[in-house]
UniProtKB/Swiss-Prot annotation:
Keyword Flavoprotein on entry: no
UniProt KW Lipoprotein keyword: yes
Recorded family membership: Belongs to the paralemmin family.
Expression sites (tissue/organ): Expressed in the lens (at protein level). Highly expressed in forebrain and cerebellum with lower expression in adrenal gland and heart. Expression weak or undetectable in other tissues.
Protein name per its UniProtKB record: Paralemmin-1
PANTHER family: PARALEMMIN-1 (PTHR10498:SF6), PARALEMMIN-RELATED (PTHR10498)
Gene: PALM
Amino acid sequence: MEAVEANTLQQERLQAIAEKRKRQTEIENKRRQLEDDRRQLQHLKSKALRERWLLEGAPSSASEEDEAMKKQMQEDEVKTKELEETIQRLERELESLENSSSVTSTKENLAEAAAPAKEEKKENIPSVQKSPLGTAIAEKKVSSSPMKAVQGTDMMKAAMYSVEITVEKDRVTGETKVLSSTTLLPQNHCVQGIKVYEDELKVVHAVSAEDGALQNGAQPLSSSEVDELLHKADEVTLGEATASGDAPGSATSSQKATPRREITGLQAKPRENSTEGAEPSREQPVTMIFMGYQNVEDENETKKVLGLEGTIKAELVVIEDAESKAEPEGKDHAPPNGTALEPAAAPLQGDEVPGGQKPGTNATEAKEAEPDMDAKKQRCKCCTVM
């Protein structure tokens, strides 16, 4: 019976496909014919317009050529009308074919969609009838209990894991306290006690007390009570894990708690920038190079022009070398301008003065010349810090 229906469906599909192809071919032929007729109609209209224009420009005298042309124009007009009617008819047929093609394709799609659904139903029905007792269906939800017995049948469902919770209940207050929680494998645990809760995912059994018997029977639990019990069991498990993790880590925590030692030493002080430059001292000697000297009038302007801002002011610059250090200390130093000192003239004996001048006159000229020498000996602005 099933084979006959399958063959019938297959034949219907093949027939629908053949009709669809035939209809598509017919539509393509109609479209091609419609395009040809439109092209021919356009040609006839342009020909008639040209002949009418030629007749209007010809003389009024009748001739055989004019009569033949008029006759041809009448025939063209008849053909034009026929082509117009044919074009309209083809358009209507083409539209009807396209509509019927869309309807047929829709029915074919619905039939193709319905056929697999029927086959699936037929396949599912025998599988359900042929499934033997004692087997687990994979599409069913897996219970969290070790083995779940289904009422009225011998079908059993394998559990993924089991949790054994030790509970202490206060008879006065009715408060439940979780003492311990242990996760067990399903194969290492068997069903004991009385079932107090069951849903699609889990089953709860009340196990006997220490004396081996349930005291005062077992009361069924609600879903909220079961959730609260599992939540407390999770808290106990986490607390045990935290306590076991803190024991080996006590030494490391004590090491981390050791305070850092302070190392006493010198404190670095930031050096202040000053326009005067660094002050020389024994701890901070200054190396300088002689670059020459120049007499200045306006110190600030000269610094800007020559780029001497930030130089060191020196009241007195002494230039000496190894040879000068070996000389006796009593010898006078060279002046700041770098010229050697002139040897002191020997004092004139007696009252003899060259040029017939008096001694008092020479002393007066020497005193007048001293201010000129002081004006030339300005402070040196010629040293820079390396």
